[in-house]
Structures are given as structure tokens and as C-alpha cells.
């Protein structure tokens, strides 16, 4: 019965755009939540019922209507770079690979806006904008592979997050296919106070309330000057205090990353303990950048920061996207990261905290991780002092599941500590399926309200079930 239904879909859209059975490549079983991560979820993934390649919002609408009537669910797919399992299918899923919907429909240079389809890769969109003297404000580590739709679905954050905001902050209007197949287009005004801001329903909800097919986004004039510098800091507390003062002074960095590293002999690459490193940058008019650096340098001198050679800053900036290439396939369904971390469980926490709680969280989090016999390998703040990341690793010796469980337990306790300090369990990647079990602890009664919204918009549960708490 299922196969007959999918066959009908293939007749409607064309067999070359509907993949089933052995024709479905293994990559559609998983996104970037894989076997080397600290998760209690099944790590093998399952083959979906079908993969469909739409070319228009009307194609998406047809597939959603079909899925709802035939009892399938629909999982949107972009670059496959999601770290939380937001694009994981079930065996009754129709995966919508949106990458053929990659047009830039228009660029308005005077208004500094663009309309682009959800499947366009962020780096390609940035290149198109730069031909018109504009740039994309969203610059995550995954930019060479991630798509616009995925960035909107997770409300992702990039290196310029403090200067430009999250991806959702840059969205003016959306084209969305709802669970009944309706194509909704929200007005792309710079500001409106005419009631509910409908586009916000679909930003950060991971395709569970509607499937984004296109967006009107802000674009930004290419800055006259971009100046990124790197510093060695005596210790993390000193660096954190200096960075906080820079923000208190009203300066607006275009990039900020304060990192400390810990030795991790289990990793297949070197990780040496040493003084924390601060990468800091400003962008804009030359005189504004110069004035910003004069203010920042005054704070850094008081903190005994040592400026590193310019090549260090250039290397940092050049390598900022390098990690994404570990997610490239080296064999069907196998990525470079799968092989690199074959004997290791690796994971991270990305939490938002009140600034006054960051140093207390650091002490607690490092203690928690070590108590679980997991090694912290990095701790830092990114884009602004309140956004904190912690990386950890545990080698696989005899029992891989034991190692994965230890890392998962450490992550959960660290995230609960962030909640106890008034923070949020995730600030950049969404929750997907990986963190859904903690949503009730963060949202409280708000989760019940969110689920009422889900039932109102998608009573059959057609759109990306099991993600984002739904």
C-alpha cells in the first residue's frame, strides 16, 4: 500500500524527482548528529519512504498535501549540516530535498534586501550579493554547505552574530508551505505593529510548523574595512572581564571568540593546554573601525593581553569554515568526521547565560564533565560574553555505548546547570531530537502552549514530527 502511494507521487512529479528503495542514497538517513556524538538516540538512522526533489513552492505544496492524505510525514532537507538531528527521517517520512530550489529571485540594492529560495547554499548567496556590493550577514562555520532554509529553521548564529543578529533577525518576510498545503507569504516590511508577527512562527521551529521555501532577507553593504586581530590572554577570567568591558563601552565587534584549550590525548589531532586566545574584530567605515580599536586596545592593555602576529588572525579567519569539510562524504553514508572520530565520542554544549553567571558556570561545567570521566577540551564565549560553548571528548576503549552514555550524561548535567543559573540550553543549533527531552525543563508551561500551536497548524503531525519538542 505504501509503495503504491509513493508510485502515485512519482507519476505526478516524475520518477527522476522521487527516489525510493535502493535508489535513496545513505546520506538521507542522518544529518550531522552521528555515531561519534554523545546521544542516547539510535545512531544508524533509517531509510525514509521516499526522497522528493521539488523545484517550486507548488511542488512542495503538492507533496505536503499528498503526505497528509496518505499518512506520511514530511522532513525538509537542506545541506545536512544540522548537529541536533533536526533533519533525521523516520521510515514513514518523505524527505524534501530543497536544494534544487536555489534561485535568488531578486536583489534590491537600494533597500539592501534580497529574496532567495530556501535551498540556496549560504556561501553561494553571499557570492551573489557581493556582485551587487552587498554581503550576507549570516556567516556560520557551515556556510559552504548549509542552506538558507536550514539557517532560518534553526535560527542559527554566525561569526557576525553580535553585529548582524541571528539568521532570524535578518529575515523580513517568508514564503512558507503550511501543513494543509497552503502557500503563505508574509509581508516583508522593515517593521510592523499589525498584530502577530507570523514569520516568527517559522523561525527556529525546524520545519515543524511550516516548510520555508523562500525568504526576503536583509543584506549588508560590504564594509569599507574589516580588521580582525588575535591576542594571548593571561587567563580566562581576565579575558572574560576585558571582553565584557569592551561590550559595556558600547563597542560592537564584528567577531569575538575567546577560547581556552585543555589537553586531550584521545583526539586524533593535537590539543595543547595554553593561555586563552581572543580573536576580536571590527568592521565598517575606516574611522569607525579605528576608533573601535583604540577603545578595545585600552581595555586589553589593562588586561595584559599580548597581541599575536597578524598571521595568527589571518589563519583563524581563513579556517573559520574548515570544520564543515569533515562532514563531506568519503564513502556512501560515511563522512570524514565518522572516520576521524571512529574511536572517540565527541560533543559540545552551547548555552546562553546571564553574564554574571558565566564564570560560575565555567567552574561547575568543568567539574561536572570531569566527574563523568569525560575530558573537556575547550571552553569559550562566542559573538558576545553571554554565549558560552564547551567541548568535550571521551575515548572509546572497550565499550562504545558506555562512552556515549557518559558523554550524554555529562551534557545533560551541564545543560541543567545552565538552566539553574537562569540560562538556555542552546543558542545556535536548535534542539532537533537531541535536546527535546530537556525542553520541558526550560520552557515549563510554555511547552504546552507551543504544542497547542502545533496542533492548531498541523493536527495530523505531518511536518517534521518529533523535532523541537513536537
Regions found by a protein language model. Name each.
Residues 103-257, 462-463:
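FAD-binding subdomain of flavoenzyme oxidoreductases
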Residues 182, 432-470:
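Activity-critical C-terminal alpha-helical subdomain
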Residues 21-101, 116, 136:
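Glycine-rich N-terminal segment of FAD-binding domains in flavoprotein oxidoreductases
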Residues 1-27, 460:
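A charged N-terminal "starter" segment
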Residues 20-36, 221, 232, 240-413, ...:
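C-terminal substrate-recognition/cap domain of FAD-linked oxidoreductases
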Amino acid at each position: 500500500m505504501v509503495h503504491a502511494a509513493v508510485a502515485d507521487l512519482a507519476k505526478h512529479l516524475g520518477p527522476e524527482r522521487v527516489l525510493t528503495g535502493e535508489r535513496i542514497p545513505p546520506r538521507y538517513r542522518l544529518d550531522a548528529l552521528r555515531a561519534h556524538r554523545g546521544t542516547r538516540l539510535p545512531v544508524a538512522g533509517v531509510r525514509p519512504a521516499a526522497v522528493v526533489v521539488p523545484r517550486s513552492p507548488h511542488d512542495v505544496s503538492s507533496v505536503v498535501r499528498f503526505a497528509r492524505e496518505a499518512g506520511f510525514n514530511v522532513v525538509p532537507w537542506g545541506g545536512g549540516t544540522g548537529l541536533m538531528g533536526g533533519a533525521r527521517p523516520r521510515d514513514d517520512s518523505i524527505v524534501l530535498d530543497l536544494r534544487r530550489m536555489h534561485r535568488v529571485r531578486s536583489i534590491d540594492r537600494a533597500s539592501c534586501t534580497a529574496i532567495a529560495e530556501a535551498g540556496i547554499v549560504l556561501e553561494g548567496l553571499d557570492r551573489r550579493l557581493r556582485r551587487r556590493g552587498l554581503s550576507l550577514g549570516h556567516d556560520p562555520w557551515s556556510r559552504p554547505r548549509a542552506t538558507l532554509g536550514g539557517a532560518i529553521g534553526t535560527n542559527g548564529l554566525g561569526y557576525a552574530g553580535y553585529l548582524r543578529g541571528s539568521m532570524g533577525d535578518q529575515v523580513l518576510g517568508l514564503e512558507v508551505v503550511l501543513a494543509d498545503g497552503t502557500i503563505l507569504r508574509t509581508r516583508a516590511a522593515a517593521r510592523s505593529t499589525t498584530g502577530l508577527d507570523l514569520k516568527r512562527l517559522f523561525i527556529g521551529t525546524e520545519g515543524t510548523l511550516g516548510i520555508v521555501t523562500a525568504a526576503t532577507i536583509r543584506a549588508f553593504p560590504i564594509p569599507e574595512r574589516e580588521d580582525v586581530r588575535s591576542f594571548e590572554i593571561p587567563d580566562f577570567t581576565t579575558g572574560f572581564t576585558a571582553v565584557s568591558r569592551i561590550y559595556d563601552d558600547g563597542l560592537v565587534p564584528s567577531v569575538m571568540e575567546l577560547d581556552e584549550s585543555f589537553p586531550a590525548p584521545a583526539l586524533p589531532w593535537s590539543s595543547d593546554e595554553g593561555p586563552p586566545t581572543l580573536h576580536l574584530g571590527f568592521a565598517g567605515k575606516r574611522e569607525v573601525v579605528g576608533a573601535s580599536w583604540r577603545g578595545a586596545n585600552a581595555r586589553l592593555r589593562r588586561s595584559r593581553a599580548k597581541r599575536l602576529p597578524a598571521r595568527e588572525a589571518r589563519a583563524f579567519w581563513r579556517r573559520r569554515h574548515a570544520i564543515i569539510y569533515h562532514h563531506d562524504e568519503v564513502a556512501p553514508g560515511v563522512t570524514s568526521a565518522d572516520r576521524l572520530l571512529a574511536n572517540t565520542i565527541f560533543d559540545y554544549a552551547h548555552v546562553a547565560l546571564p553574564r554574571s553567571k558565566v564564570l560560575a558556570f565555567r567552574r561547575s561545567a568543568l567539574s561536572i564533565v570531569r566527574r563523568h570521566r569525560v575530558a573537556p577540551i575547550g571552553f569559550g564565549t562566542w559573538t558576545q560574553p553571554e554565549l558560552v560553548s564547551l567541548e568535550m571528548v571521551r575515548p572509546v576503549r572497550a565499550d562504545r555505548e558506555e562512552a556515549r552514555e557518559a558523554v550524554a550524561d555529562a551534557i545533560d548535567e551541564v545543560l541543567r546547570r545552565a538552566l539553574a543559573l537562569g540560562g538556555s540550553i542552546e543558542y545556535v543549533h536548535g534542539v532537533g531530537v537531541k535536546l527535546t527531552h530537556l525542553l520541558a525543563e526550560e520552557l515549563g508551561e510554555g511547552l504546552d502552549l507551543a504544542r497547542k500551536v502545533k496542533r492548531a497548524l498541523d493536527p495530523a503531525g505531518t511536518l517534521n514530527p518529533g523535532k523541537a519538542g513536537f
